Curated annotation (Swiss-Prot):
UniProt keyword 4Fe-4S present: no
Stated role: Sequence-specific endonuclease that cleaves unmethylated GATC sequences. It is involved in DNA mismatch repair.
Cellular compartments annotated: Cytoplasm
Coiled coil: none
UniProt similarity note: Belongs to the MutH family.
Protein name in the entry: DNA mismatch repair protein MutH
Native species: Yersinia pseudotuberculosis serotype IB (strain PB1/+)
One term under GO cellular component: cytoplasm
GO terms of molecular function: DNA binding; endonuclease activity
Keyword Ribosomal protein: no
InterPro entries, per database record: DNA_mismatch_repair_MutH, DNA_rep_MutH/RE_typeII_Sau3AI, DNA_rep_MutH/T2_RE_sf, Restrct_endonuc-II-like
Keywords: Cytoplasm, DNA damage, DNA repair, Endonuclease, Hydrolase, Nuclease
Amino acid sequence: MSVYSLPPAPPSDEHQLFQRAQALSGFTLGELATRAQWVIPADLKRVKGWVGMLLEFYLGASAGSKPEQDFADIGIELKTIPISAQGKPLETTFVCVAPLTGNSGVTWENSHVRHKLARVLWVPVEGERHIPLAERRVGAPLLWSPNVEEEELLRRDWEELMDLIVLGKVESITARHGQVLQLRPKAANSRALTEAIGEFGQPIMTLPRGFYLKKTLTAPMLARHFLL
């Protein structure tokens, strides 16, 4: 792999994207960062999205942090997932920011969550903390769309969580709500507040929330992929 100073053009189709992802498999993050002339952080505490951004660079992603999919032209979202030596996910997976106001007419079919998860390129990365960031290896990629059962579980959780938001109960939602999808605060600091609906229909200020996939969905998915 030669030195990259500019990212490649966006992939023309799913096959090309998957080939690019396969070509990264087995490399360490340090090797990829050096070839891209990126500085490797000591850890991910202040740069949580660094691994994803590095892989986006190599794969030719275009969306950045916009609400559309990372590869909008071919309808694919990229998700990196830190895994253990046993191939199990080590944390939940961020999907998108949750809308806390203006939700009339929103259904599962036209929701951001469903749009983002329609087709996902999963790239597992070694994530155990004793492995220095630069030495963590990229794993074999997986192209995934929710099967009928997964889609039904996601829809049910999304509808339950959105009902609570619309009914003004956002403050009472905990990470335990939802079988495969959870809602929890997403903010770099506790002063970053956003508007939501209170219990009596009044506007309130609260922490922004994000939708996250629980390990109850990603662990079986990876197990099928790696034949664990």
